[in-house]
UniProtKB/Swiss-Prot annotation:
Keyword field: Acetylation, FAD, Fatty acid metabolism, Flavoprotein, Lipid metabolism, Mitochondrion, Oxidoreductase, Phosphoprotein, Transit peptide
Modified residues (Phosphoserine): S54, S55, S362
Gene: ACADL
Reactions it catalyzes: a long-chain 2,3-saturated fatty acyl-CoA + oxidized [electron-transfer flavoprotein] + H(+) = a long-chain (2E)-enoyl-CoA + reduced [electron-transfer flavoprotein]; hexanoyl-CoA + oxidized [electron-transfer flavoprotein] + H(+) = (2E)-hexenoyl-CoA + reduced [electron-transfer flavoprotein]; octanoyl-CoA + oxidized [electron-transfer flavoprotein] + H(+) = (2E)-octenoyl-CoA + reduced [electron-transfer flavoprotein]; decanoyl-CoA + oxidized [electron-transfer flavoprotein] + H(+) = (2E)-decenoyl-CoA + reduced [electron-transfer flavoprotein]
Family named by the database record: Belongs to the acyl-CoA dehydrogenase family.
Pfam families attached to this UniProt entry: Acyl-CoA_dh_1, Acyl-CoA_dh_M, Acyl-CoA_dh_N
Residues reported in the UniProt entry to bind substrate: S179, A227, R228, Y282, P289, Q290, E291, R292, G412, G413
Name of the featured protein: Long-chain specific acyl-CoA dehydrogenase, mitochondrial
Length: 430
């Protein structure tokens, strides 16, 4: 696996690591002076050493950074206007090995560990390009299929998904059920060996481009509790009665397609059931820690990006005859931001280590998601303020980062719910 990663990364870089100069980066890592630094900030994460990455991860990171520089950043403004990215970039991502990096090689992945996946979503955050829904596709949808799918389902979907030819989405949220998944109304009723699916979903990331959607539906209205009567189904694009509504116009994440989905008497074969009947809520609870960790890592990475943008801006912006960076209030604010970001990075890295060791519990994942997403919004607010009026202009990267940040405390479970779950772990005995 390591040799394949190395060959693939060097091939994308044009045959050798130094094929094209990348931004000068200087933060500390373990393993030697030639290690690739992680964020774009000059000395942002010199909190010691990010020990979770090896030199192989760094080579992989270099190729992923180059991919975003060449295949995503130049097109992102166009995608924002369209409200979706091109399918072409999905297939290019598949060829580069960005999709399902921790999937086994015989299924089209590269057999990497969690840290390879983290490299991909961190580099997307550093690119400030939120359009491609790679993290939902790889970190959430593919995880459900590989963990709970049958051998036939895995063989049918995963190779196409790692190639970027089949785009995945997951449909949980409804008009009357967001964080309260037990309140969903979408239902599936048996008809012989088939299922008949009815209902609707909203705010579905990758919904418009999706080829397969994991749909959360009620399958047993007589269950002792709603949680015991929920199942998951794999619904494919083109099935009769599966209708994609409009692309939703959002405050941020403008290039990421988000859609309404409708299911009107969709006939599903028995093979569309993902996992066991009525076990859907259990599966969701098992997968949510990874989703929340993903959000947390992208949040702190976005914070690192915003800090670097702002640090560079205040060092060249002049006011009162000197650069803004020479004002004590600005210096103190930068000191606060850097400290908060570095502390959060250390916590999130620890959570990544816990998850790789299969020891990340729900409450800790909730803490990471809650804290990092709140930090991201705080950093976004302060960085726009330090940009002054220019921070309110869309052509400045900080403006886009600001509106993209706002949804982070909402999806993956609102931060209010995160606090409830954390408190429950503290107060009540299991």
């Amino acid at each position: 696996m390591a040799a394949r990663l190395l060959r693939g990364s060097l091939r994308f870089l044009g045959g050798h690591c130094a094929a094209r100069p990348l931004p000068a980066l200087r933060c500390s890592h373990s393993g030697g002076e030639e290690r690739l630094e992680t964020p774009s900030a000059k000395n942002l994460t010199d909190i010691g050493i990010r020990r979770i990455f090896s030199s192989e991860h760094d080579i992989f990171r270099k190729s992923i950074r180059k991919f975003f520089q060449e295949e995503v950043i130049p097109h992102h403004s166009e995608w924002e206007k369209a409200g979706e990215v091109s399918r072409e970039v999905w297939e290019k991502a598949g060829k580069q090995g960005l999709l399902g990096v921790n999937i086994a090689e015989h299924l089209g992945g590269i057999g990497g560990d969690l840290y390879y996946a983290a490299v991909v979503w961190e580099e997307q955050a550093y690119s400030n390009c939120s359009g491609p829904g790679f993290s939902v596709h790889s970190g959430i949808v593919m995880s459900y299929i590989t963990n709970y799918g049958s051998e036939e389902q895995i063989k049918h979907f995963i190779p196409q998904m790692t190639a970027g030819k089949c785009i995945g989405a997951i449909a949980m949220t409804e008009l009357g059920a967001g964080s309260d998944l037990q309140g969903i109304k979408t239902n599936a009723k048996k008809d012989g060996s088939d299922w008949i699916l009815n209902g609707s979903k909203v705010f579905i990331s990758n919904g418009w481009l999706s080829d397969v959607v994991i749909v959360v539906a009620v399958t047993n209205h007589e269950a002792p509790s709603p949680a015991r009567g929920i199942s998951l189904f794999l619904v494919e694009n083109g099935m009769k009665g599966f209708i994609k509504g409009r692309k939703l116009h959002k405050m941020g994440l403008k290039a990421q397609d988000t859609a309404e989905l409708f299911f009107e008497d969709v006939r599903l074969p028995a093979s569309a059931l993902l996992g066991e009947e009525n076990k859907g809520f259990y599966y969701i609870m098992k997968e949510l820690p990874q989703e929340r960790l993903l959000i947390a890592d992208m949040a702190v990475s976005a914070s690192e990006f915003m800090f670097e943008e702002t640090r560079n801006y205040v060092k060249q912006r002049k006011a009162f005859g000197k650069t803004v960076a020479h004002l004590q209030t600005v210096q103190h604010k930068l000191a606060e931001l850097k400290t908060h970001i570095c502390v959060t990075r250390a916590f999130v890295d620890n959570c990544l280590q816990l998850h790789e060791a299969k020891r990340l519990d729900s409450a800790t994942a909730c803490m990471a998601k809650y804290w990092a997403s709140e930090l991201q919004n705080s950093v976004a607010y302060d960085c726009v303020q330090l940009h002054g009026g220019w921070g309110y202009m869309w052509e400045y990267p900080i403006a886009k980062a600001y509106v993209d940040a706002r949804v982070q405390p909402i999806y993956g479970g609102t931060n209010e719910i995160m606090k409830e779950l954390i408190a429950r772990e503290i107060v009540f005995d299991k």
